[in-house]
């Protein structure tokens, strides 16, 4: 609250709470009711609340984060203080036309009404005392759910625990949000009756009825006796002793074929290329076949 509030331009004795744009006058609640209810023309004057910070100028915007009406100067000073305040959402102030009483203030009238007329500040997440939610889904048709299972051929070897009939009560949403402790009975909205003889729907497939068992698939560690370990070490040492580091030819036929192939500058070449590089008279006798001589 500012140290010195602006006085009403009409009575000069009470702090002004709003500003009339048509009359360009700062008025208190009593004077506003007297002036703007005198005739129909005066009732159409636009009025806005004063700034809630300085209380010296008409409000220009409404800050949704602070829920406060601010003038141009206070809006600039407050929302330029730090980066967090710069992200506050502000909307232009909405003028009103109804006369207000002396008890009504700007903080009580700051509301964020969307285009559909819904009150955003009255959040549905905040519960008020005395509110009782009775059957939120009363407009929907919920048939009774009956979950049953059939015993398999082996008797009582069912995998799924038997919870057979689930009936939804109509009034299971009757709970008081203002209660300090939620009783355990508030959650007993499902009437469960366990019966293994009134079973209609099989929970376990009839073909096979195989139960899934969790087995340990890890490979067990091989435990060797000292004698077995000593034998393995000896075999390894014998193999290492007989190792030969000489060059071995794996494919002798490939090596022989590679030695027979013609080469040009160390690279394999086709036989036609080798004939041209031999300097033979290929141009004259190129079209004639070579007759082998015996």
Swiss-Prot record:
UniProt KW Glycosyltransferase keyword: no
Q: Which CDD domains match?
A: Bbox1_BBX-like
Mind naming one GO cellular-component term on file for this protein? nucleus
Could you list this entry's UniProt keywords, alphabetically sorted.
Metal-binding, Nucleus, Repeat, Zinc, Zinc-finger
InterPro entries according to UniProt? CCT_domain, CONSTANS-like, CONSTANS-like_Bbox1, Znf_B-box
User: Where does the record say this protein resides?
Assistant: Nucleus
Q: Which residues bind Zn(2+) 2?
A: 51, 54, 74, 79
Q: Which Pfam families match?
A: CCT, zf-B_box
Principal cellular location given in the protein's record = nucleus
Superkingdom of the organism of origin: Eukaryota
Q: Which GO terms describe its biological process?
A: red light signaling pathway; regulation of flower development; regulation of photomorphogenesis
Keyword hit for Cell membrane: no
Indicate the segments forming the CCT domain, all copies.
Answer: 229-271
- Zinc finger residue ranges, B box-type: 8-50, 51-93
Q: Where does Zn(2+) 1 bind?
A: 8, 11, 31, 36
A single GO molecular-function term is: sequence-specific DNA binding
> Of which family is this protein a member?
Belongs to the CONSTANS family.
This protein's name:
Zinc finger protein CONSTANS-LIKE 3
Q: Which species is this record about?
A: Arabidopsis thaliana
């Amino acid at each position: 609250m500012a140290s010195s509030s602006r006085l009403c331009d009409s009575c000069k004795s009470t702090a002004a709470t709003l500003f009339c744009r048509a009359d360009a006058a700062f008025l208190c609640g009593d004077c506003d009711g007297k002036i703007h209810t005198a005739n129909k023309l005066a009732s159409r004057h636009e009025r806005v609340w004063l700034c809630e910070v300085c209380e010296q100028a008409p409000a220009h915007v409404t800050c949704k984060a602070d829920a406060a009406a601010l003038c141009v100067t206070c809006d600039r000073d407050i929302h330029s203080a730090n980066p967090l305040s710069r992200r506050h959402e502000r909307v232009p102030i909405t003028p009103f036309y109804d006369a207000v009483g002396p008890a009504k203030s700007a903080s009580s009238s700051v509301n964020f009404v969307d285009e559909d007329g819904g009150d955003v500040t009255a959040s549905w997440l905040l519960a008020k005392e005395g509110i009782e939610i009775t059957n939120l889904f009363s407009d929907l048709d919920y048939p009774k759910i009956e979950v049953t299972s059939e015993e398999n051929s082996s008797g009582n070897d069912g995998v799924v625990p038997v919870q057979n009939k689930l009936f939804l009560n109509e009034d299971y949403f009757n709970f008081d949000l203002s209660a300090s402790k939620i009783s355990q009975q508030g959650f007993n909205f499902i009437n469960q009756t366990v019966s293994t003889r009134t079973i209609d729907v099989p929970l376990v497939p009839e073909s096979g009825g195989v139960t899934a068992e969790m087995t340990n698939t890890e490979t067990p560690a091989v435990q060797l006796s000292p004698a077995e370990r000593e034998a393995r070490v000896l075999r390894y040492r014998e193999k290492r002793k007989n190792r030969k580091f000489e060059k071995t030819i794996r494919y002798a036929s490939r090596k022989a074929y590679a030695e027979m192939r013609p080469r040009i500058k160390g690279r394999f070449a086709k036989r036609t290329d080798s004939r041209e590089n031999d300097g033979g008279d290929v141009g004259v006798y190129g079209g004639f076949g070579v007759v082998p001589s015996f």
